[in-house]
Amino acid sequence: MQTTMLKAKLHRARVTHSELEYEGSCAIDGSLLDCAGIREYEQIQIYNVNNGERFTTYAIRAADGSGTISVNGAAARLAAVGDIVIICAYVGLNQAELAAYRPNLVYVDENNQITRTSHAIPVQAA
């Protein structure tokens, strides 16, 4: 049996481009992909903090250090330049793999530059 777990998260990234006529996907600064462990063409989920939209696409690599988060194709109707998004990738793990499992969490500033990384989300206080 496999359990689907959060593999990686880019937390509160800012959309820098929205290209309706592009082939599709989401272009992400390559240094962010590397830090999070998200592979080019990997399926990702995008959660738009501004409007509540949640959608699936795949990652493509943008220039390292560029800060680019470009939502392309039909998904461009779901995210505008300046919107804050959470980008997640998931992985299926078997019971043996779960014991050592830790997600890659990447936190960015308003220019999509890495401010910190973590492998755990703090317990939410009531």
UniProtKB/Swiss-Prot annotation:
GO terms for cellular component: cytosol. The active site is at 25 (schiff-base intermediate with substrate), 58 (proton donor). GO terms for molecular function: aspartate 1-decarboxylase activity. It comes from the Bacteria. The modification Pyruvic acid (Ser) is found at residue 25. Its EC number is 4.1.1.11. Is synthesized initially as an inactive proenzyme, which is activated by self-cleavage at a specific serine bond to produce a beta-subunit with a hydroxyl group at its C-terminus and an alpha-subunit with a pyruvoyl group at its N-terminus. InterPro entries: Asp_de-COase-like_dom_sf, Asp_decarbox. Catalyzes the pyruvoyl-dependent decarboxylation of aspartate to produce beta-alanine. HAMAP family: PanD. NCBIfam families: panD (TIGR00223). This is Aspartate 1-decarboxylase.
